[in-house]
Amino acid sequence: MKNKAISNIQIDNNLVRVTKYSFMPGQETGMHKHLYDYIVTPITDGKLLLIDKNGNESYYNLTSCQSYFRKAGVEHNVINSGKQKLIFIETELKK
């Protein structure tokens, strides 16, 4: 892994896990699989490079306060491909 993003779990109970991610340009999460449906709420604008388990690359622009939802099973590495620090909150729905 190039340079790991900082993650801070803010809430973790039987219903949800809420994690704040902070990425400097070029930092990444590392390959991971989402076990639960989840919501991402960007705190800052930014650009992500997502690399899936097959090596396919996709770019996404994030807009501050514009949340999005994904189903469980997504497997990818998330990289800040922008030029500024990127922060988002991920809420995993355990039930």
PLM regions and their residue ranges:
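Short acidic-glycine-tyrosine-enriched beta hairpin
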Residues: 55-72
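Short beta-strand His + acidic residue motifs that chelate non-heme Fe in jelly-roll/DSBH
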Residues: 29-31, 49-50, 75-82
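A short glycine-rich, His/Asp/Glu-containing loop-to-beta-strand
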Residues: 3-30, 37-40, 91
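Short, conserved beta-strand element in jelly-roll/cupin
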Residues: 33-49
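Ligand-binding loop in jelly-roll beta-barrel domains
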Residues: 73-94
